[in-house]
C-alpha cells in the first residue's frame, strides 16, 4: 500500500497526479507494477471526494487496471480489524450531525446497518440500544468522545481514528478477490446528503 501524508497545496486537482508520481518513485515502484487502484468513495468532504475519485478513475482508465471503490466508513472499520466487537464509524457531517453506520468485526467484517447522516444524539441512542460490545472510530468519535462514553460506547485510540490508505486497500482487496470491480465510468461519489451549497441554492431560488 502506498500513501502520501504530506499536506498538499490548495490546488489539489493540479498537484495530486505529480504527488502520485513522486510517491511511486520514492517507493521504488514502477507504474507498470500497479495491478489495481482503490479509492474511498464517501461519505466525506464533497470537494475532496470529487477530486480524489476523479483522479483514481482517470488513473485506472489510463493505466488499464481495475478500480475498486470503498465506502469511507467501511475503511475506518478496517482500522480495527479483528477487534471482535461491533464497530461504529463516525465522520463529522457538521452542525451536530455525523455520517454513521454499524459493522461487525469478528471473524470477518460485515455491515449491520446502512450508512446515514443523522444527529449525533440519534446515532448514540440507536447504538446504545444495539447490544454487544461497541467501539466507535473516526473523527466523529473523537469529537463526541464524552457523549459516547456516557452511553457505554467505547472509543478507539486517537491513532486508530484517522483515515488510512492501507485500510482502504484492505477493504478493496477483499472486494477484488470476489470480483467486485467498479466501472470507472460509472463509479460515483457517495455523498449521502446534499452539500450546503445545493441546499442554499434551493432556498435562494424558492425550491423545496
Can you name each region flagged by the protein language model?
Residues 27-32, 61-70:
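Phosphate-handling active-site elements
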Residues 156-208:
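Acyltransferase
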Residues 23-27, 62, 80, 165-176:
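Stable alpha-helical structural segments in soluble proteins, enriched in small hydrophobic residues
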Residues 20-35, 123-134:
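Phosphate/pyrophosphate-binding loops at sites that engage ATP/ADP/AMP, CoA/4′-phosphopantetheine
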Residues 66-162, 191, 196:
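Surface "functional belts" at beta-alpha junctions
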Residues 1-8:
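Short, small-residue-biased leader/transition segments that mark boundaries at the very start
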Residues 38-67:
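DPxDG-like acidic metal-binding loop motif
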Amino acid at each position: 500500500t502506498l500513501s502520501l501524508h504530506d499536506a498538499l497545496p490548495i490546488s489539489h486537482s493540479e498537484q495530486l497526479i505529480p504527488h502520485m508520481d513522486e510517491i511511486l518513485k520514492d517507493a521504488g515502484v514502477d507504474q507498470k507494477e500497479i495491478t489495481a487502484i482503490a479509492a474511498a468513495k464517501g461519505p466525506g468532504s464533497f470537494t475532496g471526494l470529487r477530486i480524489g475519485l476523479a483522479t483514481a478513475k482517470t488513473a485506472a482508465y489510463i493505466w488499464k487496471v481495475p478500480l475498486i471503490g470503498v465506502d469511507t466508513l467501511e475503511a475506518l472499520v478496517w482500522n480495527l480489524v479483528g477487534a471482535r466487537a461491533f464497530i461504529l464509524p463516525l465522520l463529522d457531517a457538521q452542525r451536530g450531525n455525523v455520517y454513521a453506520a454499524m459493522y461487525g468485526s469478528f471473524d470477518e467484517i460485515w455491515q449491520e446497518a446502512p450508512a446515514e447522516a443523522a444527529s449525533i444524539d440519534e446515532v448514540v441512542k440507536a447504538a446504545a440500544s444495539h447490544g454487544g460490545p461497541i467501539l466507535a472510530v473516526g473523527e466523529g468519535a473523537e469529537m463526541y468522545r464524552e457523549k459516547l462514553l456516557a452511553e457505554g460506547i467505547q472509543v478507539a485510540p486517537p491513532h486508530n481514528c484517522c483515515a488510512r490508505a492501507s485500510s482502504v486497500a484492505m477493504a478493496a482487496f477483499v472486494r477484488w478477490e470476489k470480483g467486485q470491480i467498479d466501472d470507472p465510468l460509472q463509479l460515483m461519489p457517495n455523498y449521502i446528503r446534499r452539500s450546503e451549497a445545493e441546499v442554499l441554492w434551493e432556498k435562494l431560488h424558492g425550491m423545496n
